[in-house]
């Protein structure tokens, strides 16, 4: 689960992390009130969306010379004018895709004197189950660009959760960022604070870009991005309260109600599969045959008829879907349950695109019988390769 920048900073502040003063604003009036509280002389008006690249983004409906989603201004009147221009508009960045995201809230923050910029992040290393710390002197840039152009400027080290942060970790971070004296001590303190927040809130990623040295020689978090482990939300009611569903895909929200693992993609072939590994293999083979998957959807091993019906409805709700491939290898998941769910969903919502079904495993004969006797126009597949080839051919033929 992702949250907005202003929420991330509020969470970090609970652990003593130094962040600039600021206030969220959901209207122009609230933006003006926030600026008046801050007092100036410099304000930063920040669009709040769940995507990076806001500063370099562009607003739909504004000219090519218009400013991006993060603007530095020097008066309350300028805060008001920019808030009027930004709120309600769609901001397009390199992470949002062409559709962009509508800006429904702003963050009005005090300006800061920037002497240096750094990059710092914490994330889970899934190979070791340790917490990886990634640091770079190249702050304010996309870390992917830094990794590609100057990988030697990125330093990574890991922290064992069994022992936590030791003094040498703080020294390692300070050295990586070229900090000495008081700033080196602040870096060590900051690492302890961030690590404490990371563990206490079950974060999966904590990214600070940039971490700055201010004009008066102190470290301060200028931007923060936080993602939480969705599997741990049951023990964090305070984190769940921060969720902004307007930033999420409605289909993904619906899928979460049925405990379905669903991720929307940009392709044209919808997929319904049991098992994450098989789902990824299914997407790969669709691409192998020259098409693109419209989603990742894992119904899991113990899906009910109702769950399968919901999954099928979610797939068909995507207007980009031109065909559907159901690929089930029945182990715990019975093929007859899948068949009943597909038949029920098609009878309820109709079938306007080609449907290819590949069933194998537990109760496969019963599953095939249910589909064959349903009267539905379903294309049967013998195996995964056959299924992918048939759905791609059917979609291309219908185009």
From Swiss-Prot:
User: For substrate, which residues are the binding ones?
Assistant: 274, 331-333
Record-given protein name: Succinate--CoA ligase [ADP-forming] subunit beta
Signal peptide positions are none
Chain positions recorded as Mg(2+) binding sites: 209, 223
Which Gene3D superfamilies does the record associate with it?
A: ATP-grasp fold, A domain (3.30.1490.20), ATP-grasp fold, B domain (3.30.470.20), Succinyl-CoA synthetase domains (3.40.50.261)
Organism, by scientific name, is Phenylobacterium zucineum (strain HLK1)
Give the co-factor note.
Answer: Binds 1 Mg(2+) ion per subunit.
What family does the database annotate? Belongs to the succinate/malate CoA ligase beta subunit family.
Keyword Nucleotide-binding annotated: yes
* Quaternary assembly: Heterotetramer of two alpha and two beta subunits.
The protein's role, per its UniProt record:
Succinyl-CoA synthetase functions in the citric acid cycle (TCA), coupling the hydrolysis of succinyl-CoA to the synthesis of either ATP or GTP and thus represents the only step of substrate-level phosphorylation in the TCA. The beta subunit provides nucleotide specificity of the enzyme and binds the substrate succinate, while the binding sites for coenzyme A and phosphate are found in the alpha subunit.
Keywords from the UniProt entry: ATP-binding, Ligase, Magnesium, Metal-binding, Nucleotide-binding, Tricarboxylic acid cycle
* GO CC terms, sorted: cytosol; succinate-CoA ligase complex
Residues reported to bind ATP: 46, 53-55, 109, 112, 117
Q: Which cofactor does it need?
A: Mg(2+)
Keyword Metal-binding in annotation:
yes
Q: What class of enzyme is it?
A: ligase
Show the InterPro entries listed in the entry: ATP-grasp, ATP-grasp_succ-CoA_synth-type, ATP_grasp_subdomain_1, Succ-CoA_synthase_bsu_CS, SUCC_ACL_C, Succ_CoA_ligase-like_bsu, Succinyl-CoA_synth-like
Q: In which pathway does it act?
A: Carbohydrate metabolism; tricarboxylic acid cycle; succinate from succinyl-CoA (ligase route): step 1/1
- Assigned EC number: 6.2.1.5
Record GO biological process: succinyl-CoA metabolic process; tricarboxylic acid cycle
Q: Which residues form the ATP-grasp domain?
A: 9-254
